[in-house]
Regions:
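Hydrophobic alpha-helical membrane-insertion segments
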Residues: 38-54, 178-188, 380-388, 481-506, ...
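Membrane-entry segments of alpha-helical transmembrane domains in multi-pass membrane proteins
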Residues: 1-11, 27-34, 74-92, 130-143, ...
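Alpha-helical transmembrane segments and their helix-start/interface "positive-inside/aromatic belt" motifs
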Residues: 29-42, 169-179, 371-380, 472-487, ...
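Transmembrane helix-loop junctions and nearby membrane-interface residues
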Residues: 21, 25, 44-58, 98, ...
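Hydrophobic transmembrane alpha-helices and their helix-loop junctions in integral membrane proteins
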Residues: 99-143, 149-470, 494
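Hydrophobic alpha-helical membrane-embedded segments
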Residues: 44, 343, 425-437, 560-580
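Transmembrane helix-loop-helix hairpins at membrane boundaries of multipass inner-membrane proteins
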Residues: 1-5, 11, 22-119, 191-212, ...
Length: 683
């Protein structure tokens, strides 16, 4: 297996970035497009070839390209790793990434920064592929920081808008908070294991069954902090909704399908650490469950179509954390895959709607589009049913597997199951709310005059021009990727159809070598909290009880999803006056949720304002202007004073020189007489 040349996979996208980044401004648009698409297509073909040939790996394949850092006893190699987990991530990143690159040809076709957009997209692919291929935590961190940089650049793509620039800075800073945890975890790994290589760290843990708790809990919680920042979980989730200021293809690729799932990938990659710490697992599951529910309630009240999907993304990432937190890593990763399909499709379909309406994103100004843009309608319908959890679509399979694994995991897991089930109902409600408001009823564009005629990609329309705007279907470059993703939403669930429902759960068996630790001769240690909580059985996949239980839970979940659909149908199709009446009746609750629980305002008062105060009045006013500027001014004045004195001495008058010499001679004689010179070692 020496012919894999894994380093070539991220090489092509970075070449595309360099070519378009350096010369794209002078290239014709067709050449920019060709460079970007080739840079996305070649890695996809490379990955397809590798997966076809090496999907049956029983041990990770590590491809080292020499020592990268050597500092004393610590050595870090520039190495890539291939196993089933990295294969899954490679397929998602390159496959969905290629489709979104194709979609962007039509969506971004009229943009002035067309070349810059594709350069940044290729740069993101390079760093994301580096992240998932890395064989050690240090190289993973390089990719981790790189995707954050690409995210910042693409969120702020419309840099002339203050909202986009501020959103980019917000995302960058919140992610840096999480990255502190990642860095501290690496320091602990070096201090305790002397290495950052996955194989060495996990091998050391696997060979020592007595090692659990303590240091592993600390490392697991610090890694979790990094994952929480990157994957937008409580308390660092607030950057993701604002990230919708970027172009819609960016929202689909980076802030839905790939980058935001990096935290889930890291937890699955480090599963051996989490399996040895019940506290770390409990924390992962608790954060995921709480985030899923909180974000779902926020999504119910949003009117911007992209922000609804943003909160939905935060919520679905919470499901993935829940899956990993109950040690059902295969289920969590499978939901990562299916989510990439249906959430990317939802964003692309939303982009098609926005493109059709000349930049409109407010759902209150939409309606009646299902007959005017039928391909967009039917593809988005597939995604809505998938995320809502209706069988046999992929979202039903992956989400229900997580809920089932939580239910059978422990007593605490049943609490997580109940909250996850409630979240599923809310998800169905707000997704069908989006569906009805966007595609059904009459067009509300004229009636909704206060809806800003805002444009998301430099399209400035007057109200009259917008009303006259010809509603038409998007170009084929946008519709073909959407259609492919819709097909995947329908059929991908078969890959992980549970055995308890009559399937083979092929995906779980495929991923098992990478998340079971079998190649390390490793068996998860059964650790339990004193309360008999979540750690009762920290196995990678909970044992399956009788099939009847899984069937019953699947039926319950489907009924809950159906109830959410029925509620949305009643409120946004049958009786459209109900939302306004309920809002008036429960105004306090509505205001709380509509304002997102004022979390941003609380952070602003408790964190941002004190930091700005310290920066402006302590660091800037006192330290910068007082100490640094004042010290510099004092030094300058002192030097100027000595210079003036020296200038007076250097007068050119011989009598003046004689006077100064006489004065200094007298001073020297006095010093000798009183013995002052002995204090300075002068004899």
């Amino acid at each position: 297996m020496t012919d894999l040349h894994l380093w070539l996979i991220p090489l092509v996208p970075v070449a595309g970035f360099l070519v378009n980044g350096l010369f794209g401004r002078r290239f014709p648009k067709a050449l920019v497009t060709a460079v970007a698409i080739v840079a996305a297509a070649v890695p996809m073909l490379q990955v397809a070839s590798i997966v076809y040939r090496f999907s049956s790996l029983t041990r990770p394949f590590i491809e080292s390209h020499g020592t990268w850092i050597a500092a004393g006893a610590f050595h870090a190699s520039f190495a890539f790793q291939l196993d089933q987990l990295s294969m899954v991530m490679l397929c998602v990143v390159t496959g969905v990434g290629f489709l979104i690159h194709v979609y962007s040809i039509g969506y971004m076709g009229e943009e002035e920064g067309y070349w810059r957009f594709f350069a940044y997209m290729n740069l993101f692919l390079f760093f994301m592929l580096t992240l998932v291929l890395s064989a050690n935590f240090l190289l993973m961190f390089v990719g981790w920081e790189g995707v954050g940089l690409a995210s910042y650049l693409l969120i702020g793509f419309y840099y002339t808008r203050d909202s986009a620039s501020n959103a980019g800075k917000k995302a960058f800073l919140y992610n840096r908070v999480g990255d502190v945890g990642f860095l501290l975890a690496m320091f602990l790994l070096i201090a305790h294991f002397g290495t950052l290589n996955f194989s060495d760290v996990f091998g050391a843990i696997g060979s020592n069954p007595a090692m659990h708790g303590g240091i592993l809990t600390a490392i697991g919680l610090l890694l979790l902090l990094g994952a929480v920042g990157k994957s937008a979980q409580i308390p660092l989730y607030v950057w993701l909704p604002d990230a919708m200021e970027g172009p819609t293809p960016v929202s689909a690729l980076i802030h839905a399908a790939t980058m935001v799932t990096a935290g889930v990938y890291m937890i699955a990659r480090a599963h051996i650490i989490y399996d040895r710490s019940a506290i770390a697992l409990l924390t992962v599951a608790s954060i995921g469950t709480a985030t899923a529910l909180l974000a779902a309630t926020m999504g119910m009240m949003q009117n911007d179509i992209k922000r609804v999907l943003a909160y939905s993304t935060v919520s679905q990432l919470g499901y993935m954390f829940l899956g990993c937190g109950v040690a059902a890593y295969s289920a969590g990763v499978f939901h990562l895959v299916t989510h990439a399909f249906f959430k990317a499709l939802l964003f692309l379909a939303a982009g098609s709607v926005i493109h059709t309406l000349g930049g409109e994103q407010d759902m209150r100004a939409m309606g009646g589009l299902r007959t005017k843009i039928p391909v967009t309608f039917w593809t988005m319908t597939a995604a809505v049913f998938a995320i809502s959890g209706f069988p046999p679509l992929c979202g039903f399979v992956s989400k229900d597997e997580i809920l089932y694994q939580a239910f059978v995991h422990s007593e605490a897991g049943k609490v997580f199951w109940a909250v996850g089930l409630l979240t599923a109902g809310l998800t169905s409600f707000y997704m069908f709310r989006l569906w009805y408001m966007t595609f059904f009823g009459e067009s509300r564009a004229v009636a909704y005059e206060e809806a800003a005629v805002h444009a998301r990609h430099d399209t400035k329309l007057t109200l009259e021009a917008e009303h006259a705007h010809h509603v038409h279907e998007s170009p084929k470059s946008m519709l073909v990727p959407m259609t492919i993703l819709a097909i995947l939403c329908v059929i991908a669930g078969g890959l992980g159809w549970p055995e308890g429902l009559g399937g083979t759960n092929w995906f779980s068996h495929f991923l098992a070598p990478a998340v079971s630790g079998a190649h390390l001769q490793y068996e998860p240690v059964r650790v339990a909290l004193a309360t008999g909580g979540i750690g009762a059985s920290a196995t990678n996949q909970a044992p399956a009880p009788a099939n009847n239980l899984e069937i019953i839970l699947a039926i319950v979940s489907t009924l809950v999803a159906l109830s959410g659909w029925c509620a949305a149908h009643l409120m946004y199709y049958k009786r459209r006056d109900l939302p306004a009446r309920l809002t008036a009746r429960f105004h306090a609750i509505y205001s709380l949720v509509f304002n997102k629980y004022w979390v941003d305002e609380i952070y602003g008062a408790l964190v941002v304002a004190p930091v700005l105060f310290i920066a402006r009045w302590v660091l800037a006013a006192l330290v910068d202007r007082g100490v640094i500027d004042g010290g510099g001014l004092l030094a300058g004045c002192t030097a100027q004073g000595f210079g003036s004195l020296a200038a007076r001495i250097q007068s050119g008058n011989i009598r003046s020189y004689a006077g100064w010499l006489a004065a200094f001679a007298a001073l020297l004689l006095v010093a000798v007489y009183f013995g002052w010179t002995t204090h300075f070692g002068i004899r």
